[in-house]
Amino acid sequence: MSNKKADSKPQAKYPVNLLDTPFPMRGDLPKREPQWVKEWEERGIYEKIRAASKGRPKFILHDGPPYANGDIHLGHAVNKILKDIVVKSRNMAGFDAPYVPGWDCHGMPIEIQIEKQFGKSLPAAEVMSKARAYATEQIEKQKVGFKRLGVLGDWANPYKTMNFVNEAEEIRALGKIIEKGYVYRGLKPVNWCFDCGSALAEAEVEYKDRTDPTIDVMFAFAEPEKTAQAFGLPALPRAEGGIVIWTTTPWTIPANQALNLHPEIVYALVDTERGLLIIAEERVAACMADFKLTGRVVATAPGVKLANLRFHHPLASAHPGYKRTAPVYLGDYVTTDTGTGVVHSSPAYGIEDFMSCKAHGMTDSDFINPVMGDGRYIESLPLFGGLSIWDANPKIVDALNVAGSLLRSEKYTHSYMHCWRHKTPIIYRATSQWFAGMDVTPRDDGRTLREAALEGVEATAFYPSWGKQRLFSMIANRPDWTLSRQRQWGVPMAFFVHKETGELHPRTLELLEEVAKRVEQSGIEAWQSLDPRELIGDDANMYEKNRDTLDVWFDSGTTHWHVLRGSHKDQLQFPADLYLEGSDQHRGWFHSSLLTASMIDGRAPYKGLLTHGFTVDGEGRKMSKSLGNGVDPHEVANRLGAEIIRLWIASTDYSGELAISEEILKRVTEGYRRIRNTLRFLLANLSDFDFAQHAVPVDEWLEIDRYAVAFSAQLQTELLGHYEKYEFHPVVAKLQTYCSEDLGGFYLDVLKDRLYTSAADSRARRSAQTALYHLTHGLLRVLAPFLSFTAEEAWKVFQPASDTVFTETYYAYPEVAGSAALIDKWALLRDVRGNVTKALEEARTANRIGSSLQAEVAVHASGARYDALTSLGDDLKFVLITSAATVVKVDDEAQESVDVAASKYQKCERCWHYREDVGAHADHPTLCGRCFSNLFENGEIRSAA
């Protein structure tokens, strides 16, 4: 009767230590994560982290501000989560690492939104108030999205470039660089967007393919005698002909003022059916084929001999307004890669053209600049007045043809500049702007801005390292920075300029401070409503308010001034330890911040720059609406959990492109489950363990427990090294291996027998639990920076009296004597175990055994392996998870092998081992002697496993 009862309900009669935990197997992340976000906010977890970190060394990751417009996208998620991992890992490494999020609030996109909603005729004051309200609304929307991703920070007190104090400090920063002499006003070709009606920064320009007419145009001889002399001829063989240029911008022809030749390139005078043509000698054959002409070279001369010759404008015969000549200027930038080796120069529409004409004595008033800010020619331009330049292109080609100047016209697809906001083509256009001079030597420093910035690049640590050369090249080759913009919603360049000379008021620095004080109280609206007489009295008769606003890259580029040392100086400090953004920011925020700090402080505003790549789909394609391959982080968070996004980001090498697809997310989810299952096992088997009451001293632990803790401590050292270098994907890879192989596939697998079958309060079981306690402490802390929701959920089960895992620092594992030798020894044992597992699998496949516990093995080993195996004594069988194990000594590695035999004994009902002593106690015929002792006597004695 009793036996039958025991058989039907063995757990009741012969219980094992199978424990449970409130930490569930299923994460149910989409449901639980929002609860954690709410709880973190309600309980002030970020503030608790700050309190716990107070007094530690500071680590400042300065947040590059996203633009306050639109929903967050996957790129935002990558950026914010990487920052969150850095900040959390630095806090846990023993630093005081605050995170102050920020937003970029001024500029064109918001102004466009206001125009769309309310029209273009709003008074400036209304534009301002509506823009502020719109930006505030967008910030709140984005803030919810970032919090949902598990990002902790000072969300209640972010910085905003539109906050009055920040606007005021930007004006003060402008004053600083004026005081040092960097700022000047000048006419220069700048990137100009017709839709924006404003200059653009380099970072606001993108390149896309565009098809334009490409034309070869002849400028007729104006000085035939001088031209003949230049070629060493007594006279030109015929009067017809001229010099030939090639261009992809016909719209610039009406503004032509010069021609450029390379001084050392040899030019040929070619006799053709269209007259004498001057072309670079090495381009003659290609050009004749393109023009469908036959030609004979009459004479040659280097470019230097042709300098200052003049040629008629190609539209001279079409309209008297073009009856002018263009001189030849020499330029090293002319090449013979394409075209004719001759460049036509419209100085108002090209930087090199402008510089060349300036160098040859042209003044600002000499430049022909017929294109207005909206992309149309001035009405007075002959033939094409009032036309859009793009509409004028074909008409100009036709006019050139009628004038007899056109040699060839074709369609040409090329990479061309576009506005990053409007996606429309832009041009270089000479306008009067305020610039920061790259090669200006300031009043208080012997280095130019370019030199100081390049030194700043050299002093900065780059992650990955290739970023250094990229930024260095950009700084080395960039033109002067166009600081001014022609918009309303922006920080004003609050100058008073002389109505006739354009000079700044002599009290400009003092006046800027007065304006800044007003802006600090009332915002940039204070400048809009300011009557000049309030500040400059009767000087208002001679001086007027400058209407330009600052480039928004100056807004964000001076956050090291108006945030780190301004609005949030109590939390932050200068320079920042790290700026972390996408790789496009080498020409954006990294770049503008470097220039402003180099001007203000003579150094970079950061010690390190971390760059991440862009997101692509599973096939490596960029995400776009047209491809329909975009991934919405909000949708993924609601379907799979933000934790899956966090794990995907942490496990991907962010230095390149970050690929995402359903298949990739599926793999990430599987990896997450393995980690979660490991945590569940640890927590369940610690649910009856009280460290204060049950902990076993280190020197009394079983050997495998000492090994597990020593191994985990060694791994943690590696992981912290990766964290310190911002290498997150090796952290994830090693932790996944640790959970699935080192713990799940080995240590926890071996431990199950001891945890489940040893006496509940035995030294052997408490030794295992003590080790698991330390492992859990260590594991949760190294997981917390990226698996934040899960680590917190597990932590609250593990340490319910503690506020949060995020106030902890990385775990100090107990010292294990002889840990290095122990790790080496168990590496050998695990290697042998792998061979035994393989032999057991082969025996199972051959139907010689069922489970591994049905087997008895004999391990033939030599040398160190033999010594390691025999040192375990009878505990070897627990490590191999067999019912019996013996070791046979052999001479060398070649003789090593594993013999597997099925046990001839009965299976214990409780521990499932096959043992000779099953049934040795008549009252318990299905129980082995080991289980009998563990249940009813003093329990078995183990030393190793």
Swiss-Prot record:
The record's section on PROSITE patterns has: AA_TRNA_LIGASE_I
What Pfam families does the record point to?
Anticodon_1 (PF08264), tRNA-synt_1 (PF00133), zf-FPG_IleRS (PF06827)
Cofactor(s) listed? Zn(2+)
List keywords of the entry alphabetically: Aminoacyl-tRNA synthetase, ATP-binding, Cytoplasm, Ligase, Metal-binding, Nucleotide-binding, Protein biosynthesis, Zinc
- Residues annotated as binding ATP are K625
> Cofactor note, please?
Binds 1 zinc ion per subunit.
Q: Which residues bind L-isoleucyl-5'-AMP?
A: E581
Location(s), subcellular: Cytoplasm
> Single GO cellular component annotation?
cytosol
Residues forming the motif 'HIGH' region are 66-76
Q: Which GO terms describe its biological process?
A: isoleucyl-tRNA aminoacylation
EC main group: ligase
Motif 'KMSKS' region: positions: 622-626
Q: Which reaction does it catalyse?
A: tRNA(Ile) + L-isoleucine + ATP = L-isoleucyl-tRNA(Ile) + AMP + diphosphate
Q: Indicate the family of this protein.
A: Belongs to the class-I aminoacyl-tRNA synthetase family. IleS type 1 subfamily.
* Cited function: Catalyzes the attachment of isoleucine to tRNA(Ile). As IleRS can inadvertently accommodate and process structurally similar amino acids such as valine, to avoid such errors it has two additional distinct tRNA(Ile)-dependent editing activities. One activity is designated as 'pretransfer' editing and involves the hydrolysis of activated Val-AMP. The other activity is designated 'posttransfer' editing and involves deacylation of mischarged Val-tRNA(Ile).
Cite the PANTHER family for this sequence. Answer: ISOLEUCINE--TRNA LIGASE, MITOCHONDRIAL, SOLEUCYL-TRNA SYNTHETASE
Partners and quaternary state? Answer: Monomer.
Query: What is said about the domains?
Result: IleRS has two distinct active sites: one for aminoacylation and one for editing. The misactivated valine is translocated from the active site to the editing site, which sterically excludes the correctly activated isoleucine. The single editing site contains two valyl binding pockets, one specific for each substrate (Val-AMP or Val-tRNA(Ile)).
Q: Cross-referenced HAMAP family, in alphabetical order? A: Ile_tRNA_synth_type1
The record's annotation in NCBIfam families points to: ileS (TIGR00392)
Any idea what this protein is called?
Isoleucine--tRNA ligase
Species name for this entry? Burkholderia ambifaria (strain MC40-6)
Phylogenetic lineage: Bacteria, Pseudomonadati, Pseudomonadota, Betaproteobacteria, Burkholderiales
